[in-house]
């Protein structure tokens, strides 16, 4: 049969599903780059530890990277993870954050080894793109991020949203071919008393909240959108010492 033409976006999520299916007794595997085979097989009940969410952890890596000093412990995360977004630890190492793994936890520590620029293909980790766009710009690290074509059809058009909201903070981003976002250090005047719009997108709210680490404050509209994936995000920020007020 004819195989489809095109790219598979977020392949690690498919691999995560296959791995969990196999863990619970199914027989599922890739036949080739585009085809899967799943055999008739009942699932089996087994003890299973549910790992914490690496996508949510990315915002704490972001906070550590933007801080002058930081040591943050994140429970429930494994060095060997099925989650594609566990790649966040490797990428943030380029931004000066070391990941030290312990018993079902990871500790984030600052280092002075920071890349002068960051170019990365997010085809397999598109949900991390907003985190790194905001972080790199605020750290004054030029970047070129590719593999972002799925961002146009997420909860919102995330590429357009990032360009607009980063513009409010004084950063001029450029979109190339609907799949690349770049920043080469261009700045513009900040919007006075700017409030970040979230576009009903949980990741817009969580990626922009850490801006307050380097700016006096940040206002975020419709903060309740975080409930989709991290309902206790604001409460956890308060526990870490952030002052959050509803206006």
Feature names for model-found ranges:
Residues 1-247:
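Short, structured segments at the rim of ligand-binding sites
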């Amino acid at each position: 049969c004819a195989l489809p033409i095109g790219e598979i976006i977020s392949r690690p999520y498919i691999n995560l599903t296959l791995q969990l299916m196999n863990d619970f007794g199914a027989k599922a595997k890739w036949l080739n780059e585009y085809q899967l085979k799943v055999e008739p097989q009942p699932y089996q009940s087994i003890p299973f530890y549910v790992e914490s969410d690496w996508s949510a952890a990315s915002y704490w890596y972001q906070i550590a990277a933007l801080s002058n000093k930081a040591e943050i412990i994140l429970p429930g995360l494994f060095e060997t993870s099925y989650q594609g977004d566990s790649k966040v630890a490797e990428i943030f190492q380029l931004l000066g954050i070391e990941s030290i793994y312990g018993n079902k936890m990871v500790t984030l520590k600052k280092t002075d080894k920071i890349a002068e620029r960051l170019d990365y293909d997010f085809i397999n980790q598109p949900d991390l793109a907003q985190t790194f766009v905001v972080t790199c710009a605020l750290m004054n690290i030029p970047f070129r991020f590719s593999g972002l074509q799925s961002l146009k059809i997420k909860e919102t058009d995330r590429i357009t949203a990032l360009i607009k909201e980063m513009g409010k903070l004084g950063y001029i981003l450029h979109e190339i071919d609907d799949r690349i976002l770049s920043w080469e250090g261009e700045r513009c005047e900040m919007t006075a008393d700017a409030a970040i719009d979230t576009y009903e997108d949980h990741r817009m709210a969580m990626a922009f909240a850490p801006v307050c680490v380097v700016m006096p404050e940040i206002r975020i509209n419709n903060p309740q959108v975080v409930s989709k994936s991290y309902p206790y995000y604001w409460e956890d920020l308060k526990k870490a010492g952030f002052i959050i007020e509803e206006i």
